[in-house]
Amino acid sequence: MQMIKKMVLSETFPGILLIFFTFLALLCKNSSLSVIYTDFFHANFTVGFDHFQISKSLDLWINDGLIAIFFLCIGLELKYEILRGQLKNIRAVSLPIFGALGGMITPALIFAAINYSHDFAMKGWAIPTATDIAFAVGILMLLGNKIPTSLKLFLLSLAIFDDLGAIVIIALFYTDQLSALAIIICLFCIFALLLLNYYHITHLSLYVLVGVVLWIAMLKSGVHATLAGVIISLFIPLDTKNKKPYLHEVLKDLNPWVVYFILPLFAFANAGIDIRDMHLGSVFSPVSLGIILGLFLGKQLGVFTFCFIAIKLKLAKLPENIKYGKFYGICILTGIGFTMSLFIDGLAYKNSDIFEHADKLAILIASFLSAIVGFIYLKIVK
C-alpha cells in the first residue's frame, strides 16, 4: 500500500497516467469498442434551465470547460513567477514570448513554402503553429526532477503565449462571426474581476461566479472559451489582506484535480483517432509534409533560433545554470501539436476528407516524433 501511495505521489506518475490514457483512447477507437467510445464522448449533456441552457457533447464540455481550469492553473503559476519568482526580470519573461513567436512564424512559413500552389491546402497554414500544452507538460512530468524548474517554467510560459497566439489566429482567420453582445459581457466580467482584485477580495466563490459568466460569454462570443481560465488567473490576488499566501493555496487545491483527473480525461477524450483507413504513403503528400516538417522541425528550430537571437541581442536571457543543449530539448517538445493542431485542422478543412485523413495522420506522426525524440534527448543530454 505504501509503495502504491509513493508511486501515485511521484512526479512522474501524472505523466504516465496521461500517456496511458492516450494509448487507451487509440486502442478503443481502433477496435470493436470504437462505436461505444465515440457515442460516449459525443453524447449530449445540457446544463441550465428554461431559455438559459448550454447543450454540448461530452468531449466539448471537456475541451471547452475542464481545460479552462487547466489554463487557470497555468496562468496562476505564471503570474506568481512573473511577480515574485524566476520571471521577475523583463528579459526572463521576454524569452518565452520570443520563443512563441518563432514557434508560430517558422512552421507557418515551412507549410506555406510546400503548399503555396494549392489554395485549399493553404487554409491549414496554422496547423503546425500550435503546441499541445497538456501533452508537453505530460512528457515533462515523465522526466520528473531531471528537468530544472526554470526549464519547466519556460515551457509552460511559452505554451501559454503560444496558445494565446493560437486563439488570436482562430479568432482572426477561422471564426465565421464574433458576437458583439457576448464580447461586451466578457468586458463587464473582466471589469468585475478587476474590482475584486483592487479591493483585495479573497472569497473564491465570487471569482468562481464571475468566472462562470465570463466562460459562458466567451463560449458564445466565438473566441475560444479556455481563454477565460487565463483571464481569471490574472485577477486572483497573490496574498490575503493579512499578507497570507492566497494564490498558492488556490493552486494547491486545484493542482491534484488537474493532474489526476482533468488531463487524463482530456487525453482519453481527444487521442481517439481512427487510423485504420490511413495509408502511410499519404505522409508524402504536400499537406502532410507541410504539417510534419512544420511541427517537428519548424517548431523546434523556430523557438530555438528566435530565443538565441533575442539572447544575443540582450533582449532576453537564458535561465540561470542552463546550457543551450538542455534548452534545445525543451524546444523539441514544443512540436507536440496533437489536440490543438487537430482542433485547428478541423476548423481549416471543416472536417473535409479531401486529403483522406493524411492531415490527421501527419499531426499524429509529428507530435509523437516530437514527444519521443524530445524525451530521449532530455534523458541523455546533461
Swiss-Prot record:
Write out the entry's keywords from A to Z.
Antiport, Cell inner membrane, Cell membrane, Ion transport, Membrane, Sodium, Sodium transport, Transmembrane, Transmembrane helix, Transport
Q: What is the lineage of its organism?
A: Bacteria, Pseudomonadati, Campylobacterota, Epsilonproteobacteria, Campylobacterales
Known role: Na(+)/H(+) antiporter that extrudes sodium in exchange for external protons.
The UniProt entry's sequence similarity note says:
Belongs to the NhaA Na(+)/H(+) (TC 2.A.33) antiporter family.
Primary location group: membrane
According to the UniProt record, one GO cellular component term is: plasma membrane
Q: Which PANTHER family match?
A: NA(+)_H(+) ANTIPORTER NHAA (PTHR30341:SF0), SODIUM ION/PROTON ANTIPORTER NHAA-RELATED (PTHR30341)
Species of origin reads Campylobacter jejuni subsp. jejuni serotype O:23/36 (strain 81-176)
Topology of the protein relative to the lipid bilayer: Multi-pass membrane protein
**Ranges annotated as spanning the membrane:** 7-27, 58-78, 94-114, 124-144, 153-173, 178-198, 199-219, 255-275, 291-311, 327-347, 361-381
Gene Ontology biological-process annotations: regulation of pH
Q: What is this protein's record name?
A: Na(+)/H(+) antiporter NhaA 2
One molecular function GO term is: sodium:proton antiporter activity
Q: Spell out the subcellular localization from the entry.
A: Cell inner membrane
Q: Which reaction does it catalyse?
A: Na(+)(in) + 2 H(+)(out) = Na(+)(out) + 2 H(+)(in)
